[in-house]
């Protein structure tokens, strides 16, 4: 019985996921959030600046299931459409991907500038320390920048190569 219980521990560990996203300001490395828009830190490389600019263009648009998949510029975005939009702008992705595909995208672990938290049914990004998500909890839905913490249970933590 003891041996059988040990076999389940690795399976359960995969359900937990990485540590929750918690905002931490690092001077010169973290984007600043002002009036719902992100300001890139001075040291950010061009792909990160491009991702932030793309996020600012779609921030505040409504949530729309399937939004951002047929057109990179759309009237509304779902989580994977929004994540795809930013990664396309950064030159890290060709076309849109569904949430579950981000679980094997890029490289494992957190990135220096961009991190991807992907479950089968949801994905969000952390770009220069700010969370870009389509909502969590009881707040507004749709693409937006946030410094609010959120759980990451069941997420795979990935990042674009080199970022």
What are the functions of these language-model segments?
Residues 4-14:
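Bacterial N-terminal signal peptides
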Residues 15-62, 138-163:
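Intrinsically disordered, low-complexity
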Residues 36-37, 66-71, 100-105:
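Short linear capping/connector segments at secondary-structure termini
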Residues 71-90:
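Active-site nucleophilic cysteine motif
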């Amino acid at each position: 019985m003891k041996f059988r219980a040990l076999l389940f521990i690795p399976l359960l560990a995969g359900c937990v996921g990485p540590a929750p996203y918690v905002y931490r300001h690092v001077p010169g490395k973290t984007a600043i959030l002002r009036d719902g828009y992100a300001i890139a830190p001075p040291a950010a490389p061009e792909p990160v600046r491009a991702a932030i600019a793309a996020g600012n263009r779609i921030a505040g648009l409504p949530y729309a299931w399937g939004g951002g998949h047929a057109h990179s510029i759309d009237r509304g975005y779902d989580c994977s459409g929004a994540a795809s939009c930013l990664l396309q702008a950064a030159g890290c992705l060709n076309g849109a991907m569904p949430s579950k595909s981000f679980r094997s995208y890029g490289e494992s672990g957190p990135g220096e500038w961009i991190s991807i938290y992907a479950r089968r049914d949801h994905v969000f990004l952390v770009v220069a320390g700010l969370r870009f998500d389509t909502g969590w909890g009881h707040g507004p839905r749709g693409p937006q920048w946030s410094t609010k913490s959120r759980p990451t249970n069941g997420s795979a933590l990935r990042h674009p190569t080199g970022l």
